[in-house]
């Protein structure tokens, strides 16, 4: 039996730990628009160039979800397909993936396909994909993989830190005055994905050190006691080191992985930001 794990670019991972003929990974890109320029969030995207373009532009920025056809093409070619999308509260990606699932089953009623709304993005999606890979490599049945990943999702969370809010200001979600104050006072916004998939602000911290302390405080409130962590950062390896050191000082056996944010997550987290997934 052959498997595919399919995500959109709300996931930061570009590949699995080890792909094989039996298990492949497909990432369906969203597109990002800055003024009249369009960037496709695939492996060829120069994220640094995209971010420079964004900061140099005064125009509003937008993202567009993949088409059902793009998902359908990614689904084909495997007996078992597990699909995961960025939270449906922020994007139409989940709906496109659902329409493509229906089309695939019309083409091939014998294929097994399961669709997951991550209710999240970034680091939490990354953790879920890595767990899917682990479960599949155990040789479990399709039904058992679905059962176990569903249970696992109840034990994962997302916390984020924003160092810049240019995009929020440009798109009218924050006033220019608030944006300027945040920049001048070096304020970091600390928030989370709710269990409904919406993003919520938890704390405002002045400076990176206080933001790290706030992050640790919030994950402990959620029930973190040393589980796996995946930190996806936007040009900020320093904060990854600070968070990792603090977690390790409290929970020496914690397994922590880090990586760069995808184009989409960089687009919204902005330079210096992060999206961290963790187990409770």
Curated annotation (Swiss-Prot):
This is DegV domain-containing protein SPy_1698/M5005_Spy1391. Hexadecanoate binds at residues 63, 91. Keywords: Lipid-binding. InterPro entries: DegV, DegV_C, DegV_domain_contain. The keyword Zinc-finger does not apply. One of its GO terms (molecular function) is lipid binding. The lineage of its organism: Bacteria, Bacillati, Bacillota, Bacilli, Lactobacillales. May bind long-chain fatty acids, such as palmitate, and may play a role in lipid transport or fatty acid metabolism. Residues 3-280 form the DegV domain.
């Amino acid at each position: 039996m052959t498997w595919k794990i399919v995500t959109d670019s709300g996931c930061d991972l570009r590949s699995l730990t080890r792909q094989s003929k039996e298990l492949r990974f497909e990432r369906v890109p969203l597109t990002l628009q800055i003024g009249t320029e369009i960037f496709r969030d695939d492996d060829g995207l120069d994220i640094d160039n995209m971010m420079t373009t964004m900061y140099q532009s005064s125009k509003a920025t937008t993202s567009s979800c993949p088409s059902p056809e793009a998902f359908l093409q990614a689904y084909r070619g495997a007996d078992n397909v597990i699909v995961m999308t960025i939270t449906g509260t922020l994007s139409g990606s989940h709906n496109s993936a659902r329409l493509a699932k229906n089309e695939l089953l019309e083409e091939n009623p014998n294929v097994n396909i399961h669709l997951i709304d991550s209710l999240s993005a970034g680091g939490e999606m990354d953790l879920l994909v890595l767990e899917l890979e682990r479960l599949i490599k155990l040789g479990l049945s399709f039904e058992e993989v679905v059962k176990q990943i569903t249970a696992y999702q109840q034990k994962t969370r997302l916390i984020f830190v924003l160092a810049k809010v240019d995009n929020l200001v440009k798109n009218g979600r924050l006033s220019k005055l608030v944006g300027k104050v945040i920049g001048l006072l070096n304020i970091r916004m600390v928030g989370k994905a709710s269990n409904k998939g919406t993003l919520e602000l938890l704390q405002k911290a002045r400076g990176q050190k206080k933001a790290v302390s706030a992050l640790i405080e919030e994950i402990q409130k959620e029930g973190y006691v040393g589980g796996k962590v995946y930190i996806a950062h936007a040009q900020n390896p320093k904060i990854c080191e600070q968070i990792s050191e603090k977690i390790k000082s409290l929970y020496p056996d914690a397994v922590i992985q880090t990586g760069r944010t995808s184009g989409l997550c960089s687009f919204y987290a902005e330079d210096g930001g992060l999206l961290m997934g963790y187990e409770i």
